[in-house]
């Protein structure tokens, strides 16, 4: 592992440990705080960083990087440009002080989409790997689907309640599907009682009743649904961004809330031509 170093305390500890072990030129990566105020050296720290690095041989800087605060929104473009300018200046100062070239990177997924002139030596594709645009732009295709199957369909007479605490009642004779996914799997309880939908055979069907720990109920009265049919929680027909919008949160939270007990199935795709790659990312 090659650690990021964001403070003098950590830098000194790395130097001390490499000296103790007799290690030389161990690669580290210098983080600069250009406005996020989460972790990082301040721009004015660069001369001292250079001095300490040049006085020892245990560690060597391989890259310098920073993190954008609001690259996903045009309302923060002035601040983003300020961050980019600061990083460009600081990276050049660090290279001049160390007298060798560093790998430079600052763009996250939204930055890759919106600030192409600053791709530098590397970019950091995060949520874009899931086919989700952090800035709401077109071009990325969904690559992940959360799905389950219908366990049972019950015929429920008008006036009966569905689920815990009797929070939902059917106003007509209804067909209710039970699916094995609940809040312990990452399906947020705020989607209960019509707050969310699923897709069954191409049709959107509302969640009815309170979402349980391991299951929830779906109103399929108006859908040609059968036991064993596939149920899409999110995917191509129901984007994860739509779920996050309903919860007034971000897609990251939806995706990272899926619990470890949910089975993951991975597919690989070998691309042999540039045309195939363009087709995958939606380039006309």
List the predicted regions and their residue ranges:
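N-terminal non-cleavable signal-anchor helices
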Residues: 24, 60, 266, 282-284
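Conserved protein kinase catalytic core
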Residues: 37-39, 73, 114, 132, ...
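Single conserved hydrophobic/aromatic residue that forms the stacking wall/gate
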Residues: 272-284
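Short, glycine/acidic-enriched loop or turn micro-motifs at the edges of active sites
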Residues: 34-36, 70, 111, 213, ...
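Active-site-proximal beta-alpha core segment in soluble small-molecule metabolic enzymes
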Residues: 1-103, 119
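Active-site anion/phosphate-binding pocket segments in diverse small-molecule metabolic enzymes
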Residues: 7-13, 78-274
């Amino acid at each position: 592992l090659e650690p990021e170093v964001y403070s003098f305390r950590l830098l000194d500890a790395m130097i001390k440990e490499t000296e103790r072990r007799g290690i030389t030129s161990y690669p580290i990566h210098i983080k600069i705080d250009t406005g996020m105020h989460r972790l990082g050296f301040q721009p004015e720290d660069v001369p001292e960083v250079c001095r300490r690095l040049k006085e020892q041989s245990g560690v060597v800087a391989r890259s310098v990087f920073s993190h954008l605060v609001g690259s996903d929104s045009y309302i923060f473009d002035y601040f983003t440009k300020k961050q980019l300018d600061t990083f460009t200046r600081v990276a050049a100062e660090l290279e001049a002080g160390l007298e060798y070239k560093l790998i430079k990177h600052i763009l996250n997924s939204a930055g890759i989409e919106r600030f192409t002139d600053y791709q530098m030596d590397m970019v950091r594709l995060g949520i874009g790997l899931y086919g989700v645009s952090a800035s709401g732009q077109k071009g990325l295709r969904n690559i992940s689907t959360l799905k389950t199957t219908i366990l049972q369909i019950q015929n429920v007479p008008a006036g009966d309640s569905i689920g815990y605490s009797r929070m939902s009642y059917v106003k007509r004779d209804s067909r209710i599907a039970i699916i094995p996914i609940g809040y312990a799997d990452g399906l947020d309880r705020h989607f209960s009682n019509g707050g969310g939908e699923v897709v069954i055979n191409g049709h959107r069907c509302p969640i009815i009743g309170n979402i349980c720990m391991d299951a929830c109920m779906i109103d399929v009265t108006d859908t040609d649904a059968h036991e064993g049919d596939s149920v899409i929680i999110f995917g191509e027909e129901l984007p994860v961004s739509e779920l996050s919008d309903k919860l007034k949160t971000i897609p990251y939270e939806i995706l990272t809330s899926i619990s470890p007990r949910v089975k993951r199935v991975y597919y690989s795709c070998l691309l042999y031509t540039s045309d195939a790659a363009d087709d995958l990312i939606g380039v006309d």
